[in-house]
Structure formats: C-alpha cells, structure tokens
C-alpha cells in the first residue's frame, strides 16, 4: 500500500506539472485588434512586424494575413514570430570593422553618364521649352480638348466685352471747401 500511495502521489505531481506546463506555454488563442498589435510589438520588439508575411519566407500555410490567421483562427507564438521583420543587422551587417576595408567614395564616381548631343531627352526638352515660350499648354492644342479651349476663349472674350452699368470716375471729387461764414462764431 505504501508503494501504491507513492506511485499515486508521483502521478499526481506529474499531472500537476503537466497541467502547469500546458498553461504556461498556452494553447493557441485568438487575438484581434489592439491585443494583436500589442502582442506583436511584445514578441517582435525593435525588429517591427508585418501584417502579411514577407515574400520569400517559408510558407507552410496559404499566405493569409495575420488578422485572418490570429483573429479568426488560432494563433501561437511560432506563428506570431513569422510575421516579425528581420533585424537590420541580420539583413546587412555593416559593422565598423567591415566599413574600414571600403575605399573612400568621391563625387566623380557618381556622375550621370553624359547624353548624346541630340538625344531624345534633349529634343523633348526643347519641344517643351518652346511650348512654354509660346505660352500654349499642350492640353489646349490637343484635338480632344479643343472644345474646352474654345469655351475658355469665348468666356474671356465675353469678359472683355462686358461693360458695367454705371461708370465710376477714376478720381475722387474734390472736397467741398468751407465758406468763411460757416466757420465763424455762431450765436
């Protein structure tokens, strides 16, 4: 009997440990909205995260967004970590030691290649500058918008031909001078 009690006590201890471990690791749960964002920020830390998996990752499941996976289905830690961005250091390791071996770059190495004397770019630029000098936008010369141009021209002509009903003088009338009788003492 004593051995049976020890085995039973050992089984109860193991069962308690197993239940505690399952609760600690947790089963998959659903996360939505702010809870999902907070959890992603906690899991990913400074790396940041994506709402859809980046291209090139090992996709076991069909590429769904994290909202569909975690809000409508169950979500666990491993799944959350697949949506974390890669750290900057792992993508490109530019430590001070690796930069020491690089030669100094000067401005001449970044100059644009020179265009030919009569390249298409120069012809296009000359045509556009000629259009601007003539002050006629290309949209008004287009056949499709010609009716709009004619309407604008008619409106301008109507404004030029409009005459006001009353013509106001361009100068103010002279101020009336006060007569000496009006300015004298009044009794």
Swiss-Prot record:
<dbReference type="InterPro" id="IPR022353">
    <property type="entry name" value="Insulin_CS"/>
</dbReference>
<feature type="disulfide bond">
    <location>
        <begin position="32"/>
        <end position="71"/>
    </location>
</feature>
<dbReference type="InterPro" id="IPR022334">
    <property type="entry name" value="IGF2"/>
</dbReference>
<dbReference type="GO" id="GO:1905564">
    <property type="term" value="P:positive regulation of vascular endothelial cell proliferation"/>
</dbReference>
<dbReference type="InterPro" id="IPR016179">
    <property type="entry name" value="Insulin-like"/>
</dbReference>
<feature type="signal peptide">
    <location>
        <begin position="1"/>
        <end position="23"/>
    </location>
</feature>
<feature type="site" description="Important for interaction with integrin">
    <location>
        <position position="60"/>
    </location>
</feature>
<dbReference type="GO" id="GO:0046628">
    <property type="term" value="P:positive regulation of insulin receptor signaling pathway"/>
</dbReference>
<comment type="function">
    <text>The insulin-like growth factors, isolated from plasma, are structurally and functionally related to insulin but have a much higher growth-promoting activity. Acts as a ligand for integrin which is required for IGF2 signaling.</text>
</comment>
<feature type="disulfide bond">
    <location>
        <begin position="44"/>
        <end position="84"/>
    </location>
</feature>
<dbReference type="GO" id="GO:0051781">
    <property type="term" value="P:positive regulation of cell division"/>
</dbReference>
<keyword id="KW-1015">Disulfide bond</keyword>
<feature type="region of interest" description="A">
    <location>
        <begin position="64"/>
        <end position="85"/>
    </location>
</feature>
<dbReference type="GO" id="GO:0005159">
    <property type="term" value="F:insulin-like growth factor receptor binding"/>
</dbReference>
<dbReference type="InterPro" id="IPR013576">
    <property type="entry name" value="IGF2_C"/>
</dbReference>
<dbReference type="GO" id="GO:0005179">
    <property type="term" value="F:hormone activity"/>
</dbReference>
<dbReference type="GO" id="GO:0005615">
    <property type="term" value="C:extracellular space"/>
</dbReference>
<comment type="similarity">
    <text>Belongs to the insulin family.</text>
</comment>
<feature type="propeptide" description="E peptide">
    <location>
        <begin position="92"/>
        <end position="187"/>
    </location>
</feature>
<keyword id="KW-0339">Growth factor</keyword>
<keyword id="KW-0732">Signal</keyword>
<dbReference type="GO" id="GO:0043539">
    <property type="term" value="F:protein serine/threonine kinase activator activity"/>
</dbReference>
<dbReference type="Pfam" id="PF00049">
    <property type="entry name" value="Insulin"/>
</dbReference>
<dbReference type="GO" id="GO:0051148">
    <property type="term" value="P:negative regulation of muscle cell differentiation"/>
</dbReference>
<dbReference type="GO" id="GO:0051147">
    <property type="term" value="P:regulation of muscle cell differentiation"/>
</dbReference>
<dbReference type="GO" id="GO:0042104">
    <property type="term" value="P:positive regulation of activated T cell proliferation"/>
</dbReference>
<feature type="region of interest" description="C">
    <location>
        <begin position="52"/>
        <end position="64"/>
    </location>
</feature>
<feature type="site" description="Important for interaction with integrin">
    <location>
        <position position="61"/>
    </location>
</feature>
<dbReference type="InterPro" id="IPR022352">
    <property type="entry name" value="Insulin_family"/>
</dbReference>
<feature type="site" description="Important for interaction with integrin">
    <location>
        <position position="47"/>
    </location>
</feature>
<feature type="region of interest" description="D">
    <location>
        <begin position="86"/>
        <end position="91"/>
    </location>
</feature>
<dbReference type="InterPro" id="IPR022350">
    <property type="entry name" value="Insulin-like_growth_factor"/>
</dbReference>
<feature type="site" description="Important for interaction with integrin">
    <location>
        <position position="57"/>
    </location>
</feature>
<feature type="region of interest" description="B">
    <location>
        <begin position="25"/>
        <end position="51"/>
    </location>
</feature>
<dbReference type="GO" id="GO:0008284">
    <property type="term" value="P:positive regulation of cell population proliferation"/>
</dbReference>
<feature type="disulfide bond">
    <location>
        <begin position="70"/>
        <end position="75"/>
    </location>
</feature>
<feature type="region of interest" description="Disordered">
    <location>
        <begin position="162"/>
        <end position="187"/>
    </location>
</feature>
<protein>
    <recommendedName>
        <fullName>Insulin-like growth factor 2</fullName>
    </recommendedName>
</protein>
<dbReference type="InterPro" id="IPR036438">
    <property type="entry name" value="Insulin-like_sf"/>
</dbReference>
<keyword id="KW-0497">Mitogen</keyword>
<keyword id="KW-0964">Secreted</keyword>
<dbReference type="Pfam" id="PF08365">
    <property type="entry name" value="IGF2_C"/>
</dbReference>
């Amino acid at each position: 009997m004593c051995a049976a009690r020890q085995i039973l006590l050992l089984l109860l201890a193991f069962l308690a440990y197993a239940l505690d471990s399952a609760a600690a690791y947790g089963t998959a749960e659903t996360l939505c909205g702010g809870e999902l964002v907070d959890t992603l920020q906690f899991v990913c830390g400074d790396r940041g995260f994506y709402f859809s998996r980046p291209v090139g990752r090992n996709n076991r499941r069909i590429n769904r967004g994290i909202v569909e996976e975690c809000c409508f289905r169950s979500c666990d830690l491993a799944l959350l970590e697949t949506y974390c961005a890669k750290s900057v250091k792992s993508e490109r390791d530019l430590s001070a030691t690796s930069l020491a071996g690089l030669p100094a770059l000067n401005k001449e190495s970044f100059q644009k290649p020179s265009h030919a004397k009569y390249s298409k770019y120069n012809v296009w630029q000359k045509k556009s500058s000629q259009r601007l000098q003539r002050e006629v936008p290309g949209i008004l010369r287009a056949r499709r918008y010609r009716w709009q141009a004619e309407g604008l021209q008619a409106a301008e002509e109507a404004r030029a031909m409009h005459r006001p009903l009353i013509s106001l003088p361009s100068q103010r009338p002279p101020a009336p001078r006060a007569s000496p009788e009006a300015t004298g003492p009044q009794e």
